[in-house]
Amino acid sequence: MNFHVTSGTPEKQRTAALVVGIYEDEKLSSYAQRIDKASEGYVSRLIKQGDFTGKKGQALLLFALPGVKAERVLLMGCGQKDKVTAKNLRQSWSGAVKALQACGATEAMICPLEAKPKDEELTQWARLIVETAEQALYRYEHTKSKKESLKKPLAKLTLLLDQRSQQPLAEQGIQQGQAIAKGVNLARDLGNLPGNICTPTYLADEARRLAKEYKSLKAKILEQAEMEKLGLGALLAVSRGSRQPPKLITLEYKGAPGKQKPIVLVGKGLTFDAGGISIKPGERMDEMKYDMCGGAGVLGTMQACAELELPLNVIAVVPSSENLPDGAANKPGDVLTSLSGQTIEVLNTDAEGRLILCDALTYSKRYRPDVVIDVATLTGACVIALGAHASGLLSNDQSLAEHLLAAGQTSDDRAWQLPLWDDYQQQLDSNFADMANIGGRGAGTITAACFLARFTEEFRWAHLDIAGTAWLSGKEKGATGRPVPLLTQYLIQRAQEAKTS
């Protein structure tokens, strides 16, 4: 979709559809008031008659409104004025986009709720509009023989502002929104692909494709033989039950001088997880194709970073394999030697994500990182604790944790911090190795992070458990693209700090 910015009065705009917000309790947004005045109270009469209440997500399409040059006016319900949040506005705008798509409008114009928002609010609003529009129009069709037929796709959206001086701020928001939307859609596509297509080799090829598309990106893939020489024993043990060769995928972005320490993003790329010898129940096992959403999210973030040309150095590391049962697969009771030299007793082969991540975290040390952030669909315990709304966050550096929490709030891709206390480490004690790969039923998300913490003592590190936020089940089943918005916002914040320092 193409996005543009213009300024002027709403009633004088020639467009296929003009979108204005309406609050509950018969309250009109500032732009809706202008439309109401131009139409001699048409909108307010509709509301008083009960034809439109302004409830969140409600949409009403009006044709040939008197005194208004737009072909259609779409009233967008925004809920109670004093309770409008970014999440509520996303829901309202998503419903409006679907209404525009249904009516066959190929282009439309949308107004802010208020004529004179603060600078930061205007940029965030423009970004939200773009991200939500792209998300609402997303369709997965890669493995369908028949494509979904649409009347005419919504191809152009113009953001209408009160003053021309506001346009640069909105254009900045559009640029950020388009970059994030591209990254989110890439992560969703990769997550939604079935495991027989999106293999470790496919993920590696996707990294190579990104490197060809963006000159600022450089891809490097470690094959099994190279990993054996280096001693990535934990990652290789997980992959032994699969016929698909494992990969260690790196994608480097250089947007700053070489002396600037890189930010390293590590993403779990387990393209299918049957649990190995500790095999999972059959119910919903198909959703284990989503176990690579950490890796997909990291690749999507790298694309967004390249789109924005951020003045940072960022490196993605994606350990990728399958976890399947086979005569060669690792077994409960096996002891593995990781790249760090530490030994691990495997008590449950279905706790494999931490095994491929620990070698990737150790591998990240060679880049002398400023910070390392790993992203993984790691524990069912996180789904129980936080559900589908917040990702779990644990860190050995409180400043880093606070920056990520702030990025989550700004991007509406929120996280919730859990403790990483030494008290939990004893749950990983083993009589036969330096540690066990699980710590019992209690505090499963925390003990998984405690396991990873043993491989991150030499750098600042944060862990995002996205097991509850990476995909949806049920009627709306599919990958969400999270945490691309959170990670990209964190990188935007770091880039802004770099400019001012």
Curated annotation (Swiss-Prot):
**Where is this gene product found?**
Cytoplasm
Q: Which UniProt keywords apply?
A: Aminopeptidase, Cytoplasm, Hydrolase, Manganese, Metal-binding, Protease
Q: Which GO terms describe its molecular function?
A: manganese ion binding; metalloaminopeptidase activity
Record-annotated active site: K280, R354
GO CC: one term? cytoplasm
Q: Does the keyword Cytoplasm apply?
A: yes
The Enzyme Commission number assigned here is: 3.4.11.1, 3.4.11.10
Please explain the role this protein plays, according to its UniProt record: Presumably involved in the processing and regular turnover of intracellular proteins. Catalyzes the removal of unsubstituted N-terminal amino acids from various peptides.
Organism, scientific name: Nitrosococcus oceani (strain ATCC 19707 / BCRC 17464 / JCM 30415 / NCIMB 11848 / C-107)
Gene that specifies this protein: pepA
Give the main location.
cytoplasm
Question: What is this protein's name?
Answer: Probable cytosol aminopeptidase
**Sequence similarity:** Belongs to the peptidase M17 family.
Keyword Chaperone in record: no
Q: Which domain of life is it from?
A: Bacteria
Positions annotated to bind Mn(2+) 2? K268, D273, D291, E352
Q: What reaction is this protein's catalytic activity? A: Release of an N-terminal amino acid, Xaa-|-Yaa-, in which Xaa is preferably Leu, but may be other amino acids including Pro although not Arg or Lys, and Yaa may be Pro. Amino acid amides and methyl esters are also readily hydrolyzed, but rates on arylamides are exceedingly low; Release of an N-terminal amino acid, preferentially leucine, but not glutamic or aspartic acids
Give the residues the record marks as binding Mn(2+) 1: D273, D350, E352
One GO biological process from the UniProt record?
A: proteolysis
Q: Which SUPFAM superfamilies match?
A: Macro domain-like (SSF52949), Zn-dependent exopeptidases (SSF53187)
List the InterPro entries.
Leucine_aapep/pepB, Macro_dom-like, Peptidase_M17_C, Peptidase_M17_leu_NH2_pept, Peptidase_M17_N
